[in-house]
Amino acid sequence: MGKVIGIDLGTTNSAMAVYEGNEAKIIANKEGKNTTPSIVAFTDKGEILVGESAKRQAVTNPEKTIYSIKRIMGLMFNEDKAKEAEKRLPYKIVDRNGACAIEISGKVYTPQEISAKILMKLKEDAESYLGESVTEAVITVPAYFNDSQRKATKEAGTIAGLNVLRIINEPTSAALAYGLDKKESEKIMVYDLGGGTFDVTVLETGDNVVEVLATGGDAFLGGDDFDNRVIDFLASEFKSETGIEIKNDVMALQRLKEAAENAKKELSSAMETEINLPFITADATGPKHLVKKLTRAKFESLTEDLVEETISKIESVIKDAGLTKNEISEVVMVGGSTRIPKVQERVKAFINKDLNKSVNPDEVVAVGASIQGGVLKGDVKDVLLLDVTPLSLGIETLGGVMTKVIDRGTTIPAKKSQVFSTAEDNQPAVSIMVLQGERELARDNKSLGKFDLQGIAPAPRGVPQIEVTFDIDANGILTVSAQDKNTGKSQEIKISGSSGLSDSEIEKMVKDAELHKEEDARKKEVIEARNHADSLAHQTQKSLDEHKTNLNENDANEIQNAINALKECVKNDNATKAELEDKTKLLAQAAQKLGEAMANKNNAEQPKKKDDDVIDAEVE
């Protein structure tokens, strides 16, 4: 029998799991992460991006990046919740046969179609992980979802090519994941605070039965709302300091949104964090930077009413269940936003019991869904997933060439260094452009980041030794460092999620590399010929200036003319490899007389031999 995957189709993030080997296991997506952003983006080139790739480009494409589609799933256009969604969501919500839909570039999409694109990615990633076709799934929904919302969720699964065996409630699924169905009869509360929704449910468990006694929730209360409080605070502070209303700039607002989310996460473990957004906007006086410290105490004061609203919901649901707080025997915390310390503190204080946090709150619902799938279909074999670098990593060197440091397919963790040098005499700094891809030219690869190494001691080009080190740890965090071996000065950049690409992009880049292999090789040969010519012209000019008095006028003029001709050829972007090599050969022949004159006078200086470990690819 085929495997059944359990899917938590979340407002902000989605997750999937499979029941195998008598246990439920989370399935990592192709990016190596256990959760996938529930985001779909439409690019100007006609591409459709889903998940991490969609989230990454949200800053530059906010109007065509769809998130929180679950909030309008199965809603009629005239419902109050739909009107509330219109106020909060940046994309256009329209009426399609009385139901909510969205409009992107003049085309209308239903929430089911958008959700199906997320489910299709999950399905494809699960198939990649399991090594077989996946056609069946158990999908979870909030306990307060009505029939039309549940039907819409199932329709999304059908569009994605999945036979949805069961739609089950998220709190029921969470209870299964915690193994609460195996305990003696007791009453538990599931507190589920996700990225976009809040759900609190009281259940009675026992004799392998999980029964919902009462449930409540808010389709518009979640981690996003906590982020919005931080955004409003930062925007207000920025306006008071600069007079600029940053929220009117959609790209700046998206950067602010991402920074607020990161700050919220950091404050779950730290007491203070710094939001640093350089060049966030500009006015007549020049570029503006947003730098602000945010303490946990300030964050808690900004979001206090949101936390208290969840406590009010708890009180109502317990009352609806016909129980008192003292009759609740266990509290299960679900959803990524339950990591917020104040949330845990208030729930614990209200119920007066320790919280059950034994399973990852981001994964627990998907785990429970997979258990339900296991109940329906049975156990399956174990599968192991290994992580490797999906594409080569390197830096841009002289002439716009990508010089690889770590090759594609390298098992991580991995660390490798190469030594480069400068491109100009007395060059005080080098710029390190970190690249990812398989193409020969830097411009054809993905740029991951850039940093400068300052303070290089004055020296002729080719003499300084700059050691560049690529270090990928077991978490996939890439750190690139550069050190001047002479002065000891160093600089580094840390790049999270070194892939930086969707799988479709990875596949396209590998195919492009194969398709353009010969063309790229020819371009690289021209660049190498140009670099060699430039170096010869530079060195010969230097020697001629120093030893011109040892030559007769005709020989000196012949050499100078050959130098000038080669320099002009180097400057010509359309010069071919043959033309560059011909001019280089002519200069080399003319320069023989200079070498003879220098030898005859016995004052020639032998050029310092390069270190064998130094790569003959200079950094600009």
UniProtKB/Swiss-Prot annotation:
Record-level Gene Ontology MF annotations: ATP binding; ATP-dependent protein folding chaperone; unfolded protein binding
InterPro entries xref list: ATPase_NBD, Chaperone_DnaK, Heat_shock_70_CS, HSP70_C_sf, HSP70_peptide-bd_sf, Hsp_70_fam
Protein name in the entry: Chaperone protein DnaK
Family in the record: Belongs to the heat shock protein 70 family.
Keywords annotated in UniProt: ATP-binding, Chaperone, Nucleotide-binding, Phosphoprotein, Stress response
Transmembrane segments: none
Organism of origin: Helicobacter pylori (strain Shi470)
Function summary: Acts as a chaperone.
Pfam family, one: HSP70
Region of interest: Disordered: 597-620
Modified residues (Phosphothreonine): T197
Matches recorded under Gene3D superfamilies: 1.20.1270.10, 3.30.420.40, Actin, Chain A, domain 4, Substrate Binding Domain Of DNAk, Chain A, domain 1
Stimuli inducing this protein: By stress conditions e.g. heat shock.
